[in-house]
Design a protein with these regions (language model features):
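Surface-exposed helix-capping loop/turn segments at secondary-structure junctions
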Residues: 17-23, 82-84, 124-130
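Membrane-embedded and juxtamembrane structural elements of multi-pass membrane proteins
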Residues: 34-40, 44-55, 75-83, 87-88
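Post-HEXXH active-site segment of zinc metalloproteases
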Residues: 62, 78-111
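Long, well-structured alpha-helical subdomains associated
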Residues: 103-106, 115-130
C-alpha cells in the first residue's frame, strides 16, 4: 500500500513539476529514519538527473504523501539547477551560496518546498480521489 502511494505520488509530482524531463532516474527507499530525526531526504547522485529519496517507513499515509511531495520539490530544484549541492556542506540556491550556518527554517529551498508541498498534496488528492 505504502509503496503504491509513493510511486503514484512520485509520478504525479514529476508530471506537475517536470513534465518535459524524461531522463530522470529517481530511486526511492522506505527506511527507518526515526533515529535521524527526519521524515525524509533527497540527494543527488552522479548528476542532476540521478536522485535518491529516502522516506521514513513509519510515516502514515498523509504524512508520507506530504513528505514525498516535499522531497520531490527538492528533486525539481536540483534537476532544474535552481539548487546545487556544493562542497563542505554548502548549497547554491538561485545563484546565492548558503553554508551550514543557515538555520533549516531559513533555507530558501526549504521555504519553497514547504510552500509548494500543500498544493501538490491537494492536487494529488483531487486527481486520485483520496
Amino acid at each position: 500500500m505504502k509503496r503504491n502511494l509513493v510511486e503514484s505520488a512520485v509520478i504525479f509530482c514529476i508530471s506537475e513539476l517536470m513534465p518535459r524531463m524524461r531522463t530522470l532516474e529517481i530511486e526511492i527507499s522506505l527506511k527507518n529514519l526515526k533515529s535521524e530525526g527526519v521524515a525524509g531526504w533527497c540527494y543527488e547522485g552522479e548528476n542532476n538527473r540521478d536522485f535518491y529519496v529516502d522516506l521514513d517507513k513509519n510515516l502514515t499515509g498523509g504524512e508520507l504523501l506530504t513528505t514525498v511531495c516535499h522531497e520531490m520539490v527538492h528533486v525539481w530544484q536540483s534537476a532544474t539547477r535552481k539548487m546545487k549541492d556544493m562542497t563542505h556542506g554548502r548549497k547554491m540556491y538561485m545563484g546565492k551560496v548558503y553554508d551550514e550556518t543557515t538555520a533549516y527554517e531559513d533555507e530558501p529551498w526549504e521555504i519553497e518546498a514547504y510552500a509548494m508541498q500543500g498544493d501538490l498534496v491537494k492536487k494529488f488528492g483531487e486527481e486520485y480521489a483520496i
